[in-house]
Amino acid sequence: MSMFRLMGASLLAMTVGAGAAMAETSKMRIALSNNYAGNSWRQAMLKSWDKITKKAVADGIVAEAPAFTTAENQVTEQAAQIQNLILQGYNAIVVNAASPTALNGVVKQACDAGIVVVSFDGIVNEPCAYRIAVDFKKMGRIQVEYMAGRLPKGGNLLEIRGLAGVFVDDAISAGIHEGVAKNPQFKIVSSVHGDWAQDVAQKAVAGVLPSLPPIAGVVTQGGDGYGAARAFAAAGRPTPLITLGNRSDELQWWKEQKTANGYETMSVSIAPGVSTLAFWVAQMILDGKQVPKDLTVPFLQINQDTLEKSLATTEKGSVANVEYSLDDAKAVAAGK
């Protein structure tokens, strides 16, 4: 056997021995299962997914990466959608879940079929799945801590929650209530669901305002602050301190209020581009890379001194955003 053939055989043996670590993903298919698209954050999330995955397909990294969104935020509908993706033979399914627990059965089915499942934002509890999230409880707590710094005497708070039943809504709300427990000068006098959408939030707040005492602050989850402000204005009530959620209309309103009367607040949310991180994590796992089952990414916070820059780089009608590259995903997986 020639030295060339011997070297070739050795390299082949090394490649086979490396197994999944040398996996090829160019012929693999990754699908996104999304439970809801009815607000600007979800629209930005889908747009980021489309942008990054189209380039990944064009570059030959994966064969395809389509996104599928259910018509209603229903667990049964999303479960059926995921079952269909299993039958279609996708290699990985990225999930923004309608429930942290109710999809566990179908997620386990996917895992048992050899499919990689990566959940993000609305994560799932099934142990076989991967999870990508921010510290949503902390996101709730820091709003109350900010209120305590601005309103040391405390007061009544109105809480605007997100989409009922979703992990994110429960976690942020739990953090808000933990913050209030540590700052008893505040009292939550009402909680409404705004579904992370300005129009829904405005209607919900308008519905409870007539029965509420004076409100010192409004704690939110994103996509609802501007709607709350409009509801207070329509009711002829003073504008309270409202924490915001990085949407362009909220940031524009904040800038206008700062110019008009010195209004200051803070804004915080998970970047919708986290969907692109989930895509790259799925691709890395398919490529044989070792990735922790639970990954935490920082939330995106905007303060008074970063408002102008953030607004200038946020597309009108969208959300302040960060999109991830493969190198970014590798850094997150490495805990950097």
Model-found features: residue ranges?
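Gram-negative bacterial Sec-dependent N-terminal signal peptides
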Residues: 1-23
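A residue-level marker of the well-folded mature domains of exported/periplasmic proteins
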Residues: 22-336
